[in-house]
Regions:
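C-terminal lobe helix-coil module of Hanks-type protein kinase domains
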Residues: 201, 211, 237-342
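Non-catalytic accessory regions
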Residues: 1-105, 113-114
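Activation segment of protein kinases
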Residues: 110, 205-245, 276
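Conserved short submotifs of the Hanks-type protein kinase catalytic core
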Residues: 141-155, 159
Length: 456
């Protein structure tokens, strides 16, 4: 469908994405009748009338998928095998949530719908700081969906792409959060069954939260034929491990094995398991027997850290950690030892320092306690700026889309960062428009912002 500025404005009003007064403000800003569609679109985005996600759908002629019940979709934040996840806002209260919607190809299968809703109900029981909460389950006849806690941050997979590896203390802190969430669930008789980097969310404050508890159970792994057609790679991994080691489905020790594989991955920067798209090859138990010892990849890792990884990833489940609480306890003990050793080495590095009056070196970094959001499209520059800021104590959130970065700032919630850096050399007018738009939004007007431009 071909839109004019006038017809696009009317479609926005008709669908309830904005009211006429908001559209009138756009017309007033433009101050002329004969404007082209591109200019009108830019003004809509700059004034926050619609998001990029909404605009893209509008321009393709879509009329559905903008609302789920009282929640208006702002943009898509994730897509998996069985569902898509959107950031959304309640039309009346302004509450920001995540809405998980069962994908269309699964909605016609009553068993899949029933399983999706059942797993949602299971998630309602889980209330823990290290688990993403489910607030509501909506059994809509056309589009069933879950209303969930929205976590301001990134997945562990996204962060690892930037950081490449984690130091032992940081990695163990992540795994302590993971095991704490698993422990809470296991006490209620619930296992995760889909532990992987993308199902660990890291909030802007650094807290890790598990998402998608039990949703992998939607994958049919009951027969070799079903496994061959199973779309969930991790569900196949769980089935292969359990069949190869003779344990029942839903054994919590399977979760602990894959928790150990996450710890291995973030320490080494590479997966312990041979990656393959061949589903039958994933069923071969030799993948689990041929894991390279972590110490051969990272020779200088403390033995206590290697021991945690090795025990979690024991192929024999009787030699593995038996409960999340057991694994959590050993991680916490190892953390205390590493932090004590680090503190001792810091004190002995400068014999003239007075321990009672001189705080640790990191207390002098000007960035301690502050977060910076960087918007940059080039991966190498993301890494460079991030490491420079990190060396000064700042926590850094990285985005490549200026519009999406601004959407992370909500007037109803604490700001995810204390400063915004927009890099214009690659992003061009997208970065400039976002920078200018900050002056028009009351909740962003006083946020410190830096626009980086090239020397030209």
């Amino acid at each position: 469908m071909e839109f004019t500025p006038q017809s696009l404005a009317q479609r926005i009003i008709d669908l309830g994405l904005a009211d006429s007064s908001q559209i009138d403000q756009v017309w007033a800003e433009l101050r002329r009748a004969n404007i082209d569609l591109e200019t009108f679109k830019s003004s809509l985005l700059r004034k926050g009338v619609v998001t990029n996600f909404q605009l893209d759908r509008l321009l393709t002629g879509e009329r559905l998928g903008f609302f789920y019940g009282p929640y208006k979709v702002l943009y898509m934040i994730g897509a998996g095998t069985f569902a898509r996840v959107y950031r959304a806002v309640h039309r009346e209260t302004g509450r920001v949530v995540a809405v998980k919607v069962l994908r269309r190809r699964h909605r016609d299968d009553p068993r899949q719908v029933e399983q999706f809703l059942r797993e949602g109900k299971m998630g309602l029981q889980l209330r823990h700081p290290n688990i993403v909460s489910i607030y509501d389950i909506v059994n809509d006849s056309r589009t069933p969906y879950l209303v969930m806690e929205f976590v301001e941050g990134e997945t562990l997979r996204e962060i690892l792409k930037i950081r490449k590896q984690f130091d032992p203390i940081s990695a163990l802190k992540i795994m302590a959060d993971v095991c704490s969430g698993l422990d809470h669930a296991s006490r209620l008789g619930i296992t995760h069954r889909d532990l992987k980097l993308s199902n660990v969310l890291v909030s802007a404050s650094g807290r890790c939260k598990l998402v998608d508890f039990g949703l992998a159970a939607m994958a049919d792994t009951s027969t070799p034929e079903a496994l061959a057609d199973c779309p969930s790679a991790r569900a196949i991994d769980y089935a292969a491990l359990e069949r190869g080691t003779g344990v029942r489905k839903d054994d919590v020790r399977s979760d602990l094995y894959f928790a150990g594989s996450i710890l291995y991955h973030i320490l080494a920067g590479t997966s312990p398991l041979t990656e393959t798209r061949d589903r039958l090859a994933r069923l071969n138990v030799s993948r689990f027997r041929e894991v390279k010892p972590l110490g051969t990849i990272i020779p200088n890792l403390p033995q206590s850290v290697l021991s945690v990884v090795s025990k979690a990833m024991e192929i024999d489940p009787t030699r593995r950690y038996q409960t999340p609480a057991e694994m959590l306890g050993e991680i916490q003990m190892t953390l205390r030892k590493l932090e004590a050793a680090e503190s001792t080495s810091t004190k002995t590095a400068d014999p003239a320092a007075t321990p009672e009056t001189t705080p640790p070196e990191e207390d002098f970094l000007e960035g301690n306690g502050f977060s910076v959001m960087l918007v940059e499209s080039k991966m190498d520059l993301q890494d460079l700026v991030r490491e420079k800021l990190k060396s000064r104590g700042y926590r850094v959130l990285v985005f490549s889309d200026p519009a999406r970065a601004l959407e992370r700032f909500s007037p109803e919630e604490p700001a995810p960062a204390h400063c915004l850096i927009l890099s214009a050399p690659e992003l061009g007018n997208l970065a400039l428009d976002a920078f200018n738009r900050m002056l028009e939004l009351p909740h962003l007007r006083d946020l410190p912002a830096i626009l980086l431009v090239d020397r030209k």
